[in-house]
Structure formats: C-alpha cells, structure tokens
Design a protein with these regions (language model features):
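Glycine- and other small-residue-rich loops at beta-strand/loop junctions that grip anionic moieties
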Residues: 93, 143, 168, 203, ...
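Active-site flanking residues adjacent to catalytic metal/cofactor-binding acidic residues
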Residues: 43, 65, 167, 191-193, ...
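Binuclear metal-dependent hydrolase catalytic cores
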Residues: 1-164, 174, 179-180, 240-263
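Cap/insert and terminal regions of metallo-dependent hydrolase folds
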Residues: 171-258
Length: 263
C-alpha cells in the first residue's frame, strides 16, 4: 500500500506566535502537508508553508480553506513559487462572480505585497474548487462550513482511507449534520479546537469551536481519530497539554508542530 501521511507544518490559529512556551505545539499558522503516494497536497498556506520542501515527484497542490490571513500568510514566501519552471497548483475558494486569481490578488498585490502570485518566477496556476474533483489519485470533496466569510471543509480520500480537514468551524445543526456526513467513518478528522468551553460560550459567532464539540462530532460520524487544530495564539504548551490530559482519550490529540501522522 502506498504512503498516506499528514505532516503538521503549522497548527496555530489567528496569528503566528513564537517563544519556548509554545514550541511543542508550534507557533506557525495553518499548513498541513499530505503525502498520498507520489502526490503532495497542502491543506492551507499559513506561515507553516515557509518550512515546506520545494521539490516533489509530481506537481503539488495547495488547497486553501478560506482567505483569512492566517491561512495564506506563507504563500508569498514559499520558496517553490520563486523557482523558474516549477509548477504549483493553487485551489482558491472565490466569492460568487469573482475568479480565483482576483480573490488572492486582493491581498497579494501592491500596496500590501510587491507581487501578485502569478508574477512569481515559478509556474503558479490558480484554480477554483469543485465540490468533487481529483488531484492525481486523490479524491477531493468539499462543503461550505460555518465561519464568518465562509470556510470550506475538505475531505481527501486515497486508496480507501480518508481524512477530513475542518478548520475554522462553528457549525449549527444543519451544517453539523452535513459535516457528519462528509466525515462519516473517516480515518482522521481534523477539527477546530481553538476555544475552551467557556470561551466558546462567550465568543459565539467568532467561527471557532471547543474540543468537546469536536469530540461530539467524531462520535457522531464514527471517525477513528481526532486531531484538534487551530490552537489559540495565546495558549501555551502547558495549557494545551493539560487540556489533552483532561480529555483522556487515546484517539484524540492536539496537533504538534513537525509531527507526521500515518493515515
């Protein structure tokens, strides 16, 4: 069976942070590298993308769940995009009536950034999402989630195994049901766990969830493992470890920077 792995390049939410007190779980923002055989797929392009390799066996694809800054921070400094002749496919959730390139140009263009991504030396090709599509041998399925401005939940299936990436989510009843359908029997569910229960109650409408809500979804959909992501920027390693220990489930973990997980 071919390799199907997830490497955590960045799991921090909202903004990048630094310091020894946050080193174990990492300070880089959302970016995950999935290796499915010879196909590489990145989930989001946050600041963690800066540490990604730039040479691959086939054309890599970067899937952006949404265009909030913490999820696209790394694109402008990703070395591969500046290497002439290297192709990178970038999938962007554009608003209705807007093409995918224009959506990114709102940030990656003067005066906010010196170049548009399409002006880099590399061969950067920008595409819109489809609700179901194939990238190499990987089946990609998406659905709109619940987050201010929108955010896609993304399912990757490869050789009979699947992972579901559902960052930045605060689902109501209807959206929760559709997420449960998307993640049914997934081998790995990656879900927003930024808030504590108390914070989730105080910050309704912010578009994030607590671990208890993620666990409830895991149990509802029958996912085998849960990886909690999008850590609050102020949360320290000690606080995250304490939360993980309080949960006390072997199949539930908070994402750790640099970790590689076999799907």
């Amino acid at each position: 069976m071919s390799t199907f792995t997830l490497t955590i390049l960045g799991a921090r939410g909202s903004m990048a942070v630094s310091g020894q007190e946050r080193a174990q779980f990492g300070g880089a923002t959302s970016c995950y590298m999935v290796q499915a055989g010879e196909q590489t797929v990145f989930l989001d392009g946050g600041s963690g993308l800066i540490d990604a390799p730039s040479e691959f066996a086939s054309t890599p694809a970067i899937l952006l769940s949404h265009l909030h800054l913490d999820h696209i921070l790394g694109l402008g400094m990703y070395a591969r995009l500046s290497k002439k002749g290297l192709r990178t496919d970038l999938y962007v959730p554009a608003e209705e009536g807007e093409d995918a390139s224009s959506a990114l140009d709102r940030v990656y263009s003067p005066p906010y950034w010196p170049l548009r991504l399409g002006e880099y030396a590399g061969d950067v090709r920008i595409f819109p999402f489809s609700s179901s599509m194939r990238i190499g041998n990987v089946l990609v399925e998406t659905m709109p989630g619940a987050h201010p401005g929108g955010c896609l939940a993304i399912k990757l299936t490869f050789e009979g195994k699947s992972l579901v990436y559902a960052t930045d989510q605060e689902p109501d009843g209807e959206t929760l049901g559709r997420l449960a359908d998307l993640a049914k029997d997934a081998d790995l569910l990656m879900f927003d766990g930024q808030f504590t229960d108390a914070e989730a109650e105080m910050k309704k409408g912010f578009g994030h969830s607590a671990p208890s809500e993620a666990i409830a979804l895991m149990e509802r959909c029958g996912a085998k493992r849960l990886l909690l992501i999008h850590h609050d920027p102020l949360r320290t390693d000690a606080q995250i470890l304490a939360a993980e220990q309080a949960i006390g489930l072997e199949n539930v973990r908070f994402a750790r920077a640099g970790e590689t997980i076999r799907i």
